[in-house]
Amino acid sequence: CASCHMPPSQHGGTNHRFAASRDVHMLRSAAKIIGSRDGDELVITFTRRAVGHAFPTGDLFRRLRVLARDAEGNLVSAELGRKTKLGPTADNRPFVRGDQTAIRLPIGSGAATFRVVYERVQHPLTEDESVAIVTESVELARGAIEARGLE
């Protein structure tokens, strides 16, 4: 942990800020994030770059949120993080099971836009993660997907 989160300081020794989730550059360099189309789905692929663990870390108050808007303006989203429940969907963070993770969202055949946002949230009181109160966010990626047949 210390080699990344406590780098050498300008004055000798190491920097004890333990830079991580509040360092925008560090967040944006953790993964290469690419959006592409596969039929009527948006595929967001996360490829590990500068992070030695799942992203975000196991803190339940941090997550990645993928937001996509289809040609009609409809919003679809997915939350990636550790959950307070057991089972196969309890942890869907990138890099839990390898160096590349892909998620899929339905967007239809028209053009679409997407954003990937790192969020700090107050713990949701329901299983619907979309109602969690976001206390801080950093945009990690954004892009546009052409209509099917035009890409």
Predicted regions and their residues:
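Short, conserved sequence motifs used for protein processing/export or organelle targeting and
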Residues: 3, 7-151
